[in-house]
Amino acid sequence: MTRLATLITLAGLLAVSPGAYAQRNRNDTGGSTGAEGLNSLAVKAGLLYFGTASDTRNFADEPYMSVVNNTNEFGMIVPENSMKWEATEKEPGRFSFANADRVRALTKANGQMLRCHALTWHSQLPNFVKTTAWTRDTLTAAIESHISNEVGHFAGDCYAWDVVNEAVNENGSFRDSPFHRTLGTDFLAISFRAAAAADPNAKLYYNDFNIETPGPKANAAMGIVRLLKEQGVRIDGVGFQGHLTVGSTPSRAQLASQLQRFADLGVEVTYTELDIRHKSLPVSSRAAQDQARDYVSVIGSCLDVTACVGVMVWQPTDKYSWIPETFPGTGDACLFDANMNPKPAYTSVSSLLAAAAATAPASVVPPASVTTSKTPIQAGAGRETVSIAGLTLALSSLAFGMFML
C-alpha cells in the first residue's frame, strides 16, 4: 500500500459520520453467515471486492436482502438486467433508468461499489435496434447516443462498465448482430470510445463466457483487446463470466494461467458472473463437496494473479439463479441455497479467503469509494495504485476488524 493510499484511507475514515458507522455495523451483522464475510475476507486477502448480481425484482425479499445488503459479505453489486439496452431505451432517444437508479441507490445507501452491465450486446435489445435498416452512420449515432446517455447518467458511480458483452462465438468468429453486420469490428472501438468520453474514470471491460481456458474463443477475446489497443482505444479489463459446471471446472493452476495470459496484454481481469452448476439434481453430499472444490479453484486462481481484482457471483442464492430456466435439469449453482443458508461451497470459499488474508501483508485497505486508477494493471504490478473517486461512501471495503465500535 502506498503512503498516498494510506492517507486517502485515513481521510475517508475521518470523513465518516457516526450514522455511517452504524449503517456499516447493521450491514455487517446481516445475513446468516457470521461476522467475517466473503467481502471483508477478500479485501484482507488483497482483492478489491467480493460482490454479487442482484436486481429490483428481488428487493422485496427480506431474508435475501439481509444478505445482499451485508457489506461484510458483498462489497459490490451489479444489476442483472436493469442497465441493458432493452431496459433503458425501448424507443429511440427515450431513456428510462428507474430500476437501475434503484440499484444505484441501494449501493449508495449500503456503501457498496457498483458494477455496471452491459452496453453493446447482441441480446436483450429493443425492437428498434433489431429491426431498423441501419447504415454505418445511423447505427454509429445510435450506439453513441445510447452509451453517452446511459454512461453519462451513471458517471462517477460505476467502478466498471461491461462495454461490449459476448461478441464472439465458440469458434472465434464474431457473433451475428446488428452491430457486426453493419459496422464490422468497428463497433468495438465506437462503443469503447463513447464510454470513455461519457465517464473517463470508469473501468472499461470486454466481458464473455467460455474464455476461462485456451481455445478459439479465448484467442478471439484476446484479439479484441489487442485490436483496441492498436487503435489507441482504452480498454481496462476483461471479465471472465465463469458460468461453469461441477466436475468440469479447470484446475486452479489452469485458470490462473489463463487469467495471466490476458493480464499480460496490460488489462485487469475479474470473474464477473460466477456460478458453478450441478449437472443433475438433487445434489448428493459428495457433489456438494465437488462444487466447493471447484469454487475454491476459481477464486483461488484470482488470488494467484495480481491483475485479478475481484470476484462477482451471479446471484448469491439458488432461489433466484438463472440456471434452471436456461439449462433445465441442472442447478444449485450458487453459494447459498434457496433458503439463504450457506452451502459447503460458501464454507470452503470462506476458509480459502481467510487463509489468504492471514498470510497477506498487513496494510490499510482502501474504502470501496477509492477505486483503482484508470491505468490498466500490468502483469506483476501491485494492487495498491489508487485514485479518489469521492470519499462519501468510505466504509464498505475497509478491513473490518480495524475499528470496532
Swiss-Prot record:
As given in the record, the signal peptide range reads: 1-22
Q: Which InterPro entries match?
A: GH10 (IPR044846), GH10_dom (IPR001000), Glycoside_hydrolase_SF (IPR017853)
Could you say which EC number(s) this protein's record lists?
3.2.1.8
Pathway membership: Glycan degradation; xylan degradation
Glycosylation, residue list: N27, N69, N171
> Tell me, what is an example of a GO biological process annotation in this record?
xylan catabolic process
Residues carrying the lipid (GPI-anchor amidated glycine) are: G380
Q: What is this protein called?
A: Endo-1,4-beta-xylanase 5
Q: Which gene encodes it?
A: XYL5
